[in-house]
Amino acid sequence: DKMPNNFSNICFLKLILPNAKIINACRHPLDSCISSYKQLFYKGQSWSYDLFEIGEYYLEYDRMMRHWHNLFPGEIMDFHYESVLEKQEIETKKLLDFCGLEWEEQCLKFYETKRSINTASSEQVRQPIYKGAMYAWKNYESHIGELIETLSPLLNDLNDDAKPQSLRK
């Protein structure tokens, strides 16, 4: 399940399903926030309609995920979008290993599935991995100053090529 609010339910999930493996799908903070801003969610995501609120929400998500990692060491895998784009097969094998699943060549052809998919990204699941969305936030950099400022505690820890110009030294 990839609902944006589910990170807050990890403790409950681990209580009712103690052997559950948690996969945290990660992306560059600005790309993640811009993606949420562009998506019209059904309900329960009112934070996604304002860039400042998105930034604050993302900081809370980051804080909570650090807490869950400390509370459940080795039971949460951070699956980084950018790493998957660069090394899809290697990262997919790591994911399957974490889940205790066997490798199948079809894992690289996920887009060939015939089953119904009901998510905000259902169209993306029906095509090969698209690299054009990586660092897409750079297209909006001159318009997202408030978001950059809000996320600066996280962005300052990134390599310079992943930082907004305003935060580079």
Where are these regions (language model features)?
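Conserved phosphate-donor/acceptor-positioning beta-strand/loop module used by diverse small-molecule
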Residues: 13-37
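Short beta-strand segments
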Residues: 1-3, 21-26, 78-83, 96, ...
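PAPS-dependent sulfotransferases, especially Golgi type II membrane carbohydrate sulfotransferases
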Residues: 36-78, 86-169
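Conserved nucleotide-binding/hydrolysis micro-motifs of P-loop NTPases
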Residues: 6, 27-32, 84-86, 116
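Glycine-rich phosphate-binding loop used to anchor ATP phosphates in small-molecule kinases
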Residues: 1-12
